[in-house]
Amino acid sequence: MNAVQFQKTGEPFAVLKTLEIDRPVPKAGEVLVRMLATPINPSDLMYIRGRYTVPAQCPTTPGFEGVGVVEASGGGLRGRLFMKRRVVVLNRRGGNWADYAVVPATEVIPISSCLSVEQAATFFVNPATAWVMTREVLKVPQGQWLVQTAAGSALGRMIIRLGQTTGFKTFNIVRRESQVEELRSLGADHVEVFDEAKNMPDALIASIRRTTSISGAGVGFAIDAVGGAAGSAVIQSLGHHGRMLAYGTLSNEPLSFSPRVLMTTSSKVEGFWLGRFMAGVSLPFKLSLVRRLTKLIDAGVLSTEIARTCTLNQIQDAVKAAEDSSVAGKVLLRIAEA
């Protein structure tokens, strides 16, 4: 079978190769999935560069998300139930950028046939992260503000549409002026341009406080995918008992702030990783989440825009497009027909 692999961590364009390897065999509790499609997410690129939460054990195949059909089971009730079913594959170990992937049966979930392959392939990482962070963890109330960095990303756009649907307001931080009107057209309540090389964090802090609270006391809810100066400024904008979820490190720079910031406001900074969250919830919760996400994707609230589709043999072109800031939408690896 064909699989994209890397022998050592590094720049994706340089280290990724499409190779012919043996088809894996599922063990007890695992299933063999014939992959149909899988996206290129920022977390995949961080994994390839050696910057992800879980270090890569090279040689290895990347790919944490995708859709496929269960072709074989190593044994177990779930494996038997899912045979020949189309499933979402949330592969915490990576391995989806291949013709076939072996995963624990607990990491595949049947998906509705009403969703296209493209939407099914991008079903979990962004849509589930957007929903779980705002509705299950932070539980942002109607009328309250949520500050988010990386607002121009695919996930950031979902957050904006989700805010419009469920009633919370969004303060959106982007790096380029060209993104402002586009996000406003999606329903963003406020868009702020911040580039750490050009703008002062104090100005961003003041704008957040001024916009999100009448008294300038600070914002109650925030999510950060960037870290560095932007994420640090958001922390310093939190109000009394404010909460920020850190779910990404796109800048590869650490958060920097005085503990006094948290002490004086009793605010909190918490980490969020979807894979760990999903590992800790029950199958009924997962199935309920799938039904909810399916409706929201079908309604266009949590749908993913596909910018380009490539094959496994076009992996260099695919990762180049995925890292091109002018490309609006996801790059998808289409592996097989349903």
Feature-to-residue mapping (PLM):
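Glycine-rich NAD(P) Rossmann-fold beta1-alpha1 loop
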Residues: 127-128, 150-157, 228
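Short, glycine/polar-rich helix-capping loops at beta-to-alpha or helix-loop-helix junctions
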Residues: 96-98, 175-182, 254-259
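NAD(P)H dinucleotide-binding glycine-rich loop of Rossmann-like/cofactor-binding domains
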Residues: 87-150
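Glycine-rich phosphate-binding loop and adjacent beta-alpha segment
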Residues: 229-301, 334-338
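Short, well-ordered loop/turn sites that connect or cap secondary structure elements
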Residues: 80-82, 140, 238
